C-alpha cells in the first residue's frame, strides 16, 4: 500500500496588485474660462493618463477651498486660454503657498502655452522654485552630512600599583611636544589679586598728580573737573568775565546816543582856517569870489595850482 502526499495548494488566492511607487503623478490647474469648455479638457486628458492625473480649479485653490496632498506631484501644468490671461492672473502668492508643498523635489511647474511674466515669475521664485527652461522647478534638498569633530583620545587604563600601561612603565614619563589645550581643565584656576603684587613701599608711595591741572596738550584749553577744588574753575570764570568786559568796552567807543544821531556831524578841522579866513579847512568852498568854489575840500598837504582859471590838483 503506497501513500502519496499532495503538496499542491488547495486555496489559490489572487495576488494583490502592487502599487508602482515610481509612477509619476500630474496636476492640471484649470481656470474657469478653460473649465467651461468640455472639449478642451477632453483634449488635455487624451494626452495624460487619467489614473495618474488630477484636475483642480485655480480659483478654488486660490480661495483656499482645496487642500493638496504634500509631496505628491511631479508635474504641475497650468492650462491656458489663448483668448484670456485669466490663468496667469490667478497665480497669486496664495496659490504658490498651497502648490509648492504638494510638489516633489525636482517637480516642474509650467504653462500649457507661453511662459510666466516678470511679476508672476518673481512670486514663483519667492515661493522657493527655481527658473529653468521656460518653467520652474522645485530644487532638490541635499541631505545634511554630519561632521565628526576630532576629540581627545581616551587614555588607556593604567595600573595604579606599578604604573604600567599596555605592558610599558609610564611612571615619570612625559610626552614631548605641545599638547592640546583643554579649557575644561582651567576652570579651577584662581584669579590673582593685583593688590597682593604690591609691596608696602609701593602702597605708601603717593600717587603722581599733574600740577595745577595742566593738561598734556598745551594747545587745548584747560578744562576744570566737574567738582573742581583746585581753583582752576574760578580762574577760568574770571578770565571769561575780563574778556567779556574788554569786548563791551571796545564796542562802547563807537556807540552813539539817540540825540547824537539827530545833530549834523562837523568834519572841519578845529582851529585852522583858509588863506582868506572865510572858511575853515575841510569845509566846502562857498564864497562867490573863491577860485575853489564848487570843489570838494582839499586833503591836508595837497598842492593846488590855478592855471587859466582852472584848478589843477
Curated annotation (Swiss-Prot):
Give yes or no: UniProt keyword Heme. Answer: no
Region ranges (N-terminal SAM-like domain): 20-145
Q: Which cofactor(s) does the record list?
A: [2Fe-2S] cluster; [4Fe-4S] cluster
- Specify whether Glycosyltransferase is a keyword of the entry: no
Enumerate the InterPro entries for this protein: Anamorsin (IPR007785), CIAPIN1 (IPR046408), Dre2_N (IPR031838)
> Where is the motif Cx2C motif 2 annotated in this sequence?
287-290
Where are the residues of the annotated region Fe-S binding site A?
213-230
Q: Which GO terms describe its biological process?
A: iron-sulfur cluster assembly
Give the region (Fe-S binding site B) as residue ranges.
276-290
What does the UniProt function comment say about this protein?
Component of the cytosolic iron-sulfur (Fe-S) protein assembly (CIA) machinery required for the maturation of extramitochondrial Fe-S proteins. Part of an electron transfer chain functioning in an early step of cytosolic Fe-S biogenesis, facilitating the de novo assembly of a [4Fe-4S] cluster on the scaffold complex cfd1-nbp35. Electrons are transferred to dre2 from NADPH via the FAD- and FMN-containing protein tah18.
**HAMAP family registered for this protein in UniProt:** Anamorsin (MF_03115)
The subunit structure is: Monomer. Interacts with tah18. Interacts with mia40.
| The protein, known as | Fe-S cluster assembly protein dre2
Its gene is dre2
Amino acid at each position: 500500500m503506497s501513500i502519496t502526499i499532495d503538496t499542491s495548494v488547495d486555496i489559490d488566492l489572487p495576488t494583490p496588485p502592487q502599487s508602482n511607487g515610481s509612477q509619476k503623478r500630474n496636476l492640471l490647474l484649470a481656470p474657469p474660462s478653460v473649465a467651461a469648455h468640455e472639449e478642451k479638457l477632453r483634449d488635455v486628458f487624451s494626452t495624460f493618463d487619467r489614473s495618474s492625473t488630477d484636475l483642480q480649479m485655480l480659483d478654488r485653490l486660490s480661495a483656499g477651498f482645496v487642500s493638496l496632498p504634500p509631496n505628491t506631484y511631479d508635474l504641475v501644468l497650468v492650462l491656458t486660454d489663448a483668448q484670456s490671461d485669466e490663468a496667469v492672473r490667478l497665480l497669486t502668492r496664495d496659490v504658490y503657498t498651497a502648490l509648492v508643498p504638494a510638489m516633489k523635489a525636482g517637480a516642474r511647474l509650467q504653462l500649457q502655452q507661453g511662459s510666466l511674466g516678470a511679476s508672476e515669475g518673481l512670486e514663483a521664485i519667492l515661493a522657493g522654485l527655481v527658473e529653468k527652461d521656460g518653467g520652474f522647478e522645485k530644487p532638490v534638498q541635499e541631505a545634511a552630512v554630519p561632521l565628526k569633530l576630532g576629540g581627545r583620545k581616551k587614555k588607556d587604563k593604567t595600573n595604579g600599583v606599578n604604573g604600567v600601561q599596555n605592558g610599558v612603565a609610564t611612571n615619570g614619563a612625559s610626552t614631548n611636544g605641545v599638547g592640546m589645550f583643554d579649557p575644561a581643565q582651567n576652570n579651577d584656576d584662581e584669579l590673582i589679586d593685583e593688590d597682593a603684587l604690591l609691596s608696602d613701599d609701593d602702597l605708601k608711595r603717593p600717587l603722581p598728580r599733574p600740577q595745577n591741572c595742566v593738561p598734556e596738550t598745551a594747545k587745548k584749553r584747560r578744562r576744570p573737573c566737574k567738582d573742581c577744588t583746585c581753583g582752576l574753575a574760578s580762574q577760568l570764570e574770571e578770565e571769561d568775565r575780563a574778556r567779556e568786559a574788554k569786548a563791551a568796552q571796545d564796542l562802547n567807543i563807537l556807540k552813539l546816543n539817540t540825540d547824537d544821531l539827530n545833530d549834523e556831524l562837523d568834519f572841519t578841522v578845529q582851529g585852522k582856517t583858509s588863506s582868506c579866513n572865510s572858511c575853515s579847512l575841510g569845509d566846502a568852498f562857498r564864497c562867490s569870489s573863491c577860485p575853489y568854489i564848487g570843489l570838494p575840500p582839499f586833503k591836508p598837504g595837497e598842492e593846488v595850482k590855478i592855471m587859466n582859471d582852472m584848478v589843477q590838483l
